[in-house]
Amino acid sequence: MKIIAKKDLFINDEIRVREVRLVGLDGEQLGIKPLSEAQAIADDANVDLVLIQPQATPPVAKIMNYGKFKFEYQKKQKEQRKKQSVVTVKEVRLSPVIDKGDFETKLRNGRKFLEKGNKVKVSIRFRGRMITHKEIGAKVLAEFAEKTQDIAIIEQRAKMDGRQMFMQLAPIPDKK
């Protein structure tokens, strides 16, 4: 059953059609009934008559407890929002002539970001005449990728953009 937003649902007295295809409480088909008879059946069961498919011919109405239905729907929406994870891109900036200790610190930070599930953009900024030695920058990026290959995959290979060379790493998805 496709869930429709409240503004599209018609309940009990809001329904303005002559006859409906009626679906019972347990989902069983009760056939095509006049609206008055369908409302009487819903009243006898002490529940609501909800028009769930107004475009169908004849429109489909279901006998259900609308309050409970609305609560379950909101609960499901809340669960879906909880399950959504926001992936952010963190940046680690390096230099083509980076010292070993500095490189290890940047590598440790990059690994922390990846372990938390974030993507990491590793960028190298070329200053002055360093731009003539792009291979040194590529070597630094390759070393960074090699040392994080156990927890990350290369999402975007090293490429130049102006005076910067960058690559993007993503955490390895969990294998379930």
Curated annotation (Swiss-Prot):
Main location per the UniProt record: cytoplasm
Gene Ontology terms describing biological process: ribosome disassembly
Keyword annotations of the record: Cytoplasm, Initiation factor, Protein biosynthesis
Protein localization: Cytoplasm
A Gene Ontology molecular function term of the record: translation initiation factor activity
Pfam family, one: IF3_C
Record-linked InterPro entries: T_IF-3_C_sf (IPR036788), T_IF-3_N_sf (IPR036787), Translation_initiation_fac3_CS (IPR019813), Translation_initiation_fac_3 (IPR001288), Translation_initiation_fac_3_C (IPR019815), Translation_initiation_fac_3_N (IPR019814)
Intrachain S-S bonds: none
GO cellular component terms, semicolon-separated: cytosol; membrane
Signal peptide region: none
Highest taxon of the lineage: Bacteria
Oligomer status and interactors: Monomer.
Record family assignment: Belongs to the IF-3 family.
Stated role: IF-3 binds to the 30S ribosomal subunit and shifts the equilibrium between 70S ribosomes and their 50S and 30S subunits in favor of the free subunits, thus enhancing the availability of 30S subunits on which protein synthesis initiation begins.
Protein name: Translation initiation factor IF-3
